[in-house]
Amino acid sequence: MARVAWGLLWLLLGSAGAQYEKYSFRGFPPEDLMPLAAAYGHALEQYEGESWRESARYLEAALRLHRLLRDSEAFCHANCSGPAPAAKPDPDGGRADEWACELRLFGRVLERAACLRRCKRTLPAFQVPYPPRQLLRDFQSRLPYQYLHYALFKANRLEKAVAAAYTFLQRNPKHELTAKYLNYYQGMLDVADESLTDLEAQPYEAVFLRAVKLYNSGDFRSSTEDMERALSEYLAVFARCLAGCEGAHEQVDFKDFYPAIADLFAESLQCKVDCEANLTPNVGGYFVDKFVATMYHYLQFAYYKLNDVRQAARSAASYMLFDPKDSVMQQNLVYYRFHRARWGLEEEDFQPREEAMLYHNQTAELRELLEFTHMYLQSDDEMELEETEPPLEPEDALSDAEFEGEGDYEEGMYADWWQEPDAKGDEAEAEPEPELA
């Protein structure tokens, strides 16, 4: 009955835009709001029944709802995570001071909880049931795009199918079957690789690529401007990612007070550690190794070419935080120090930049804490709070023979269809459909 009600509600969507058009997490249209799990579940049901247009419509809606939830979580937690007041140690010290410190800690927790409750009470994303953890992981890995590209293709929306397939591959570059579909779509539309669009791309990715191109062309001034902007935008997105990891958590076991808190904290830690990898750009099918360090590497040489040795030295010192054994950068720092009098450099000019120190310390401490939880808090299935759903993909990789032959492959993911066109431009085997919302 509830499913029918949601279905009737979504008939009102009409010509609503794609998941990122005219978006506002504060003023999300009430008529577009529904539980993420319901939207995604209905999309998969329609996919199973080969109702391609309806499936694509709900998949796009689910992606939009996921973004709404993600941005709303990050907003509230960022606004409720101000610096704690300075602690005043008890002059007597000892157990009294320890007791007071614990009370201050839990007082701070209660204050933040009250702030979050006030914030979430005003935002649309929290007016519907919260999705389960496994579903959020699926969206983080861009799994919905694996369904979406094929549903769009079968609905004769090839341009959007190309973007959806490419978006999935940007996070899953080794998924051979989707790569083959993307090549097929590109061949039908004559779409060059340079024209492909990542629907989940962060703003800093394009700025970083432009900075690298300017660097390679010798325009070091413009390159440093763009690289500094890319660095600043990345760190802002990283901070929002950390804040978004403090959202709702499920716990189904009865536990003592401190173990229960530790479980929730460990889950949040894992999410925060994953932020670095999840935000790393994919360039040409490869993730940029040590992305933040790479930006400082470019800045170091570009500033040197601009004769701004002070910034070059600080960029080199910042890079060394992430790769202290890099012999080339070590030699660069030795060179800067040797000529420090010539350039008027002070000792402070050989210190890492403030934002580099903060980012390095954050990521290092998060990894250390997570390693601690893995070593000491996972015995006796302490961290296994729920059973997760089995993966939607088969465990065995598909061979080319399976792909080219007839019959089933990736059961539950793609229809029993694959046929190379006789000539470029042949249409897919599907009835013409009206425009998708």
UniProtKB/Swiss-Prot annotation:
Q: Where does this protein chiefly localize?
A: endoplasmic reticulum
Region annotated Disordered, chain positions: 381-437
Question: Which first-to-last residue range defines the signal peptide?
Answer: 1-18
Q: Write out the annotated subcellular location.
A: Endoplasmic reticulum
Instruction: State whether keyword Signal applies.
Output: yes
The record lists glycosylation at N361
The entry's keywords: Endoplasmic reticulum, Glycoprotein, Signal
Q: Which residues form a coiled coil?
A: none
Q: Where is the composition biased (Acidic residues)?
A: 381-413, 428-437
What tissues has this protein been observed in? Detected in fibroblasts (at protein level). Detected in spleen, prostate, testis, ovary, colon, pancreas, kidney, placenta and heart.
> What top-level branch of life does the organism fall under?
Eukaryota
Q: What's a Pfam family this protein contains?
A: TPR_leprecan
Q: Name one GO biological process term.
A: synaptonemal complex assembly
Keyword Endoplasmic reticulum found: yes
For this record, the Gene Ontology CC terms, alphabetical, are: catalytic complex; condensed nuclear chromosome; endoplasmic reticulum; intracellular membrane-bounded organelle; nucleolus; synaptonemal complex
What does the record note on quaternary structure? Answer: Interacts with PLOD1, P3H3 and PPIB. Identified in a complex with PLOD1 and P3H3.
**What's this chain's function?**
Part of a complex composed of PLOD1, P3H3 and P3H4 that catalyzes hydroxylation of lysine residues in collagen alpha chains and is required for normal assembly and cross-linking of collagen fibrils. Required for normal bone density and normal skin stability via its role in hydroxylation of lysine residues in collagen alpha chains and in collagen fibril assembly.
Q: Which family does it belong to?
A: Belongs to the leprecan family.
Protein name, please? Endoplasmic reticulum protein SC65
Q: Which organism is it from?
A: Homo sapiens (Human)
Its organism's taxonomic lineage begins at: Eukaryota, Metazoa, Chordata, Craniata, Vertebrata
